[in-house]
Amino acid sequence: MSANNSPPSAQKSVFPATVSAVLPAPSPCSSPKTGLSARLSNGSFSAPSLTNSRGSVHTVSFLLQIGLTRESVTIEAQELSLSAVKDLVCSIVYQKFPECGFFGMYDKILLFRHDMNSENILQLITSADEIHEGDLVEVVLSALATVEDFQIRPHALYVHSYKAPTFCDYCGEMLWGLVRQGLKCEGCGLNYHKRCAFKIPNNCSGVRKRRLSNVSLPGPGLSVPRPLQPECVPLLSEESHTHQEPSKRIPSWSGRPIWMEKMVMCRVKVPHTFAVHSYGRPTICQYCKRLLKGLFRQGMQCKDCKFNCHKRCASKVPRDCLGEVTFNGEPCSVGTDADMPMDIDSSDVNSDGSRGLDDSEEPSPPEDKMFFLDPTDLDVERDEETVKTISPSTSNNIPLMRVVQSIKHTKRRSSTVVKEGWMVHYTSRDNLRKRHYWRLDSKCLTLFQNESGSKYYKEIPLSEILRVSSPQDFTSISQGSNPHCFEIITDTVVYFVGENNGSSSHNPVLAATGVGLDVAQSWEKAIRQALMPVTPQASVCTSPGQGKDHNLATSISVSNCQVQENVDISSVYQIFADEVLGSGQFGIVYGGKHRKTGRDVAIKVIDKMRFPTKQESQLRNEVAILQNLHHPGIVNLECMFETPERVFVVMEKLHGDMLEMILSSEKSRLPERITKFMVTQILVALRNLHFKNIVHCDLKPENVLLASAEPFPQVKLCDFGFARIIGEKSFRRSVVGTPAYLAPEVLRSKGYNRSLDMWSVGVIVYVSLSGTFPFNEDEDINDQIQNAAFMYPPNPWREISSEAIDLINNLLQVKMRKRYSVDKSLSHPWLQDYQTWLDLREFETRIGERYITHESDDARWEIHAYTHNLEYPKHFIMAPNPDDMEEDP
């Protein structure tokens, strides 16, 4: 055998045992286009199969040996070519050995035929004519394949819809939207923004495709198209293949260009230059993949490559900063738009063309809205792999969920201990100094009998502490005792804490027992910070030399149109930092408690530093509207506090929201009876708003709060950050609200009026009764509304009355002039129901206030009950609400 036909010594097995990279097998665009894979994909070729049958006149059967695995294949004789066999090899590797594939494998594999009669058993195949029936063909990797080839592994991306909050694995920012939020790699399962797809490194691990090499493949399983080179295939269109199963989607090969990949690998790896950074959007640490939590300065960001991580993770990040890598003349670094300030524009116009008075436009893109996620929300399943196909009997609409714009946060299971240790104290009632093991958390100060037991002597809720002051009252001290170090003042008793032994030097032994000025001062500082965990303490700045700092912490309380200066919110309310109730347009809502009365409240904390100075008036929009609203169906505003950095809006605290009630129901939807009861209350509250020319603009189940956990609860509207003052014949054009509940005129940037809220009511009725959103984003809203088969599929709409569907149809009218008003909706037969009226009257009697029904209807319903032999209760309260009579039109 000649040297040319012998396998070179440098050749190596195509599947070494130590290969760890997992990679698909793309090949260059210059490879033959008549390969086997194309024919396999359209069915004109029989797929290779494991068979023992003998070849016929029209087929050639032979064995392919790849490493330690043999595959029996059959190919049509007229289609047998060297390129076809190589295509077949690539397909087998792609499915059975993804960890051994690499970029451009097609051009770097050699085929050898086993010839047992030759001294050199392996004979290099240079033509398909050398392959005969029953031959054993060995696949060998060429010496031209380098380590670099194995390191370049492109991702196979397809458009994907996520059912849970998901973050981009490249830049760390959230994937926004309701559907088709980003791209998922079919090989490794990582998720990316579309804008990041051209920047990601070609490092697919292929873990989702990895298959045991000793498992035989079925015949049809090998009919996989050979993908083109990354430079030759554009990204998959968002409009196509979105709702196909992953196995049926055609992946798009994307990532950095190969020339850039080679350039990056040759660069010298340098350490990152980290600096503390504040993020305006939810971002995860790119090292530990956990959320960067907080209001500001949440983490560290590399100044050069924009890598994001926790402060604790910065020291663990590899020294692999790429610097300012450019692509098409633009930086490839991540997070460039996360640093941009929120751009707020003003473009409201009334019907007469005049400018709106306090109507600066909200940030137009929904992505600019700030919100924070609780880590427990990220533990759920990140996505689903399949989507139900459209059929007349099942709905293809999006299941009802808490949209990303208004994530529902849950309270943590346990408070974090802020400080613990031994401390001494006596009180204004008992001057005997006692020693206990103090433990301070975010809600209370507990005095334990010892450091390990669960028995405690006293528990002091932080909400009962009126203030912490320096030592002033020494009248209660026993004779001969050392003075105390600071005082904790509550409504009923004063705690004199610490013992000043007069020593100027630190004594560790005494400090461990709670004696000494330094240990007491550390406790004083910790308690002051715990009293107001979300803002600097005004009470800390007490010395005359700190006048400037004191002014910075001065607050103003606005309550019942009265202005009180130098009022610190921490002296009136206790804010629980670990009890996050939710997030609104401009801030986060925390649970809180009034110190003197113990009343539970909800406190929205707004960070003014995130917005331009000229837009500060917009931050007060919600407060300005709520101050003039006094209605049982609208959340009550107690007061507002303001510092130069923050605004604190104090409101009544309610039990939960309507969305939570819907999702927790047995079928994830509400019965008609309860829906009627709640929708009537919503419409009555809207009637009060519209009478005052106020349009909510962001009505959705998340903003309908429940006062209790009863089956028929009182509901109240909240979150007026988007609300607008719109006259009866006026229009606005500013971008407002949540897209899933918005009317078409807002989504199309056309003028809208108060009928905007009525469209939202229609969506609320729909999602309450069905548990799904009414529209699929893939189709035009007009077409979907006119197609009753898809708008109201039998499951579940066969169980729902035709009157409910009729009301929904009259509310979901694309033309605003045809859309029902509040009064027309309340007069609709679906809501004019005797049982609904009884439920509402029972509720009004229970709370002792009549504001939903009207006394003029009593006679009509009494006649109705008499006519139909129904019971008419006599215990209902009869007096209407005087305020309701004055305000209603």
UniProtKB/Swiss-Prot annotation:
Catalytic activity reads: L-seryl-[protein] + ATP = O-phospho-L-seryl-[protein] + ADP + H(+); L-threonyl-[protein] + ATP = O-phospho-L-threonyl-[protein] + ADP + H(+)
Per UniProt, what is one GO molecular function of this protein? ATP binding
Documented EC number(s): 2.7.11.13
The record places its Phorbol-ester/DAG-type zinc fingers at 154-204, 271-321
Which InterPro entries does the UniProt record give?
C1-like_sf, DAG/PE-bd, Kinase-like_dom_sf, PE/DAG-bd, PH-like_dom_sf, PH_domain, Prot_kinase_dom, Protein_kinase_ATP_BS
Gene Ontology CC entries for this record? cytoplasm; membrane
Q: Which domain of life is it from?
A: Eukaryota
Identify residues that carry Phosphotyrosine: Y426, Y457, Y741
Gene3D superfamilies assigned to the protein according to its UniProt record, in alphabetical order: 3.30.60.20, Phosphorylase Kinase, domain 1, Pleckstrin-homology domain (PH domain)/Phosphotyrosine-binding domain (PTB), Transferase(Phosphotransferase) domain 1
User: What is this protein's name?
Assistant: Serine/threonine-protein kinase D3
What species is this protein from? Answer: Mus musculus (Mouse)
Traced from the root, the source organism's taxonomic lineage reads: Eukaryota, Metazoa, Chordata, Craniata, Vertebrata
